[in-house]
């Protein structure tokens, strides 16, 4: 009995810790092994996770986005940290629009293409193409590299001004003007895109020809796996 009484304070403390720990460690509970939250690796990264809200080409929140956070494979996050460090030394910061994307979100895109157009959304994100043709044009796919966990959509910000660099088109503007090498943008806008591209390539990422914001780690750790866990905290 005396031993039990002595142990009670410790039992109470242990119980209290078990109650409080989920509040402090909930973030890690939702990330599978091999994945990390980008902000844990790159605290200076700005996040603007578009598919969590309605400011995207669907005009609504997308399935699987339960929090406005960014997740990547550990390898991709570390490589992106090198990108960020390099750019910060030049007065720039990275702003992330999307990173890991669950397969359920990709499926939601497919469902969306079968519905009616919203003229307001269409004019902002895909004015010169029908949504049913977005797959054929290479803007959407039934399997996305984002679901493998090593692809990121991002832009650059001027740290001093706190503004995005002018890239000639905005994120998710599904149009030829968003392609690398587009002749429809100015020399200054081309230089901004090239700064992002050369720095990303320097640290092991490859670009996607149709979208200036889209990069994938060349030596990605899960080249044949497509994940479906939610983007959550």
Regions found by a protein language model. Name each.
Residues 12-13, 219:
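Intrinsically disordered, low-complexity segments enriched in polar/charged small residues
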Residues 215:
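Conserved metal-phosphate-binding beta-hairpin within the catalytic cores
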Residues 6, 210-211:
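Short, low-complexity intrinsically disordered segments
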Residues 13-22:
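Bacterial N-terminal signal peptides
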Residues 25-99, 104-107, 111-210, 219-233:
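Extracytoplasmic cell-surface/polysaccharide-interacting catalytic and binding patches
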Residues 2-12:
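Bacterial N-terminal signal peptides that target proteins for export
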């Amino acid at each position: 009995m005396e031993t039990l009484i002595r142990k009670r304070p410790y039992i109470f403390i242990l119980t209290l810790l078990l109650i409080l720990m989920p509040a402090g460690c909930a973030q890690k509970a939702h990330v599978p092994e091999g994945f990390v939250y980008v902000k844990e690796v790159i605290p200076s990264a700005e996040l603007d996770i578009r598919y969590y809200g309605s400011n995207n080409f669907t005009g609504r929140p997308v399935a699987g986005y339960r929090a406005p956070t960014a997740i990547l494979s550990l390898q991709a996050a570390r490589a992106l940290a090198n990108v960020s460090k390099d750019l910060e030394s030049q007065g720039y910061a990275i702003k992330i629009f999307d990173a890991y994307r669950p397969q359920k979100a990709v499926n939601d895109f497919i469902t969306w293409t079968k519905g009616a157009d919203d003229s307001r959304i269409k004019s902002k994100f895909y004015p010169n193409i029908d949504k049913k043709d977005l797959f054929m044009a290479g803007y959407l796919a039934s399997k996305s590299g984002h679901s493998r966990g090593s692809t990121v959509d991002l832009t650059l910000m001027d740290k001093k001004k706190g503004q995005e660099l002018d890239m000639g088109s905005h994120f998710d503007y599904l149009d030829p003007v968003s392609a690398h090498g587009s002749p429809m943008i100015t020399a200054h806008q081309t230089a901004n895109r090239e700064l992002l591209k050369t720095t990303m390539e320097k640290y092991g990422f490859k670009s996607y020809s149709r979208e200036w914001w889209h990069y994938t780690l060349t030596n990605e750790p899960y080249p044949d796996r497509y994940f479906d866990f939610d983007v959550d905290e």
